[in-house]
């Protein structure tokens, strides 16, 4: 189980990313349309003035149940270990243990 402070920090990053997403996209689009170097530098400074944690690359997918940051399945938003436990407890329909 991840520490609660790490989970809250990740939620804060998600809120910041949603808040500044449209502004960041519009600035990037504006930068691609502008040809003068001075204008590009001005736009670049505006991008840099945005909060660091509002960048989408700073986000990390975490398991919804445990908060584990690794081995997550994107479709389920759960870690592999939790999916395995749920399959063994017959909570996932159609999942059987493989053998060969």
Swiss-Prot record:
Native source organism of the sequence: Cryptomeria japonica
Name the UniProt record assigns to this protein: Small ribosomal subunit protein uS14c
Key words of the record: Chloroplast, Plastid, Ribonucleoprotein, Ribosomal protein, RNA-binding, rRNA-binding
Domain of life: Eukaryota
PROSITE patterns for this protein: RIBOSOMAL_S14
Main location: plastid
Gene Ontology BP annotations: translation
One GO CC term on file: small ribosomal subunit
Chain segments annotated as transmembrane: none
Lineage summary: Eukaryota, Viridiplantae, Streptophyta, Embryophyta, Tracheophyta
Family from the record: Belongs to the universal ribosomal protein uS14 family.
GO molecular function per UniProt: rRNA binding; structural constituent of ribosome
Function in brief: Binds 16S rRNA, required for the assembly of 30S particles.
